[in-house]
Amino acid sequence: MAEFEDQLVFNSISARALKAYFTAKINEMVDELVTRKCPQKKKSQAKKPEVRIPVDLVKSSFVKKFGLCNYGGILISLINSLVENNFFTKDGKLDDTGKKELVLTDVEKRILNAIDKSSPLYIDISDVKVLAARLKRSATQFNFNGHTYHLENDKIEDLINQLVKDESIQLDEKSSIKDSMYVIPDELIDVLKTRLFRSPQVKDNIISRTRLYDYFTRVTKRDESSIYVILKDPRIASILSLETVKMGAFMYTKHSMLTNAISSRVDRYSKKFQESFYEDITEFVKENERVNVSRVVEYLTVPNITISSNAE
């Protein structure tokens, strides 16, 4: 009987201790849930119609190869699909035809020749969008109302002045208080959207000179999308556990691998780096407030000098 009573006391103590333990743990979990900010759900947006790329702005040999000459415009999704299904091996690696016919930089070709196809650094289907985008080139001019307008990054003021002079856009004097405001017709917006792949930001067909200038600056800026990037310091590869290849004095890794490695070390709620990781890279990245991954990639890499091959 005494032994039974001792067991009851022991069980009673264990139950109280267990209850206290679980209560403390539950409180900690609740506190963590309360202090954390739940990621906001993105508002559902109506899917925008896909822009068609004018045939003359797509690499001519690609157009001929796939019989696209008579298309009124080529969807970028079609270009993506053709690239993925015709220039890659069954295991998703760029094949020899792709190396010859797609637009690759000289550095990219050298890297591909220096590494094995089984290497995670080898160009694969994750790079399809970059390769497909290179098959289209930016327009150097557009036509409207019988006039031809040339697009040059250092002559945008001249372009806007010419549009005004030709009355392709009209100054709206009533709205022009802090900045010159222009009326831009729907027909011109359609031409710009078709030819330059994006529309200017307008409200009720009105646009400020500043926004119009920024628009033409963006559309005339050269696309510098890279498959490989140069690391500023070999230690970065070690910190992020990145595969690399050395070309001369430079150490290269894949842009996508670097981006993914950085993203995986950012807390999804605070948008800050994990403290231990930030301590390792603080020499290269000076702040840890709401990390912009693309900006951090810039901090950790050296700008590439791009020389394209197979371009037309």
Swiss-Prot record:
Classification via InterPro entries: Poxvirus_I1 (IPR004969)
The protein depicted here goes by the name Telomere-binding protein OPG077
- Spell out the family assignment given in the record's similarity comment: Belongs to the orthopoxvirus OPG077 family.
Listed GO MF terms = DNA binding
Gene encoding the protein: OPG077
Q: State the organism of origin.
A: Vaccinia virus (strain L-IVP) (VACV)
> What causes induction of this gene?
Expressed in the late phase of the viral replicative cycle.
Cellular location(s): Virion
From which lineage does this chain's organism come?
Viruses, Varidnaviria, Bamfordvirae, Nucleocytoviricota, Pokkesviricetes
GO CC annotation: virion component
Task: Cite the entry's keywords alphabetically.
Answer: DNA-binding, Virion
What this chain does, per the entry, is described as: DNA-binding protein which binds to the hairpin form of the viral telomeric sequence. Required for the production of mature virions (MV).
Q: Which domain of life is it from?
A: Viruses
Coarsely, its chief localization is virion
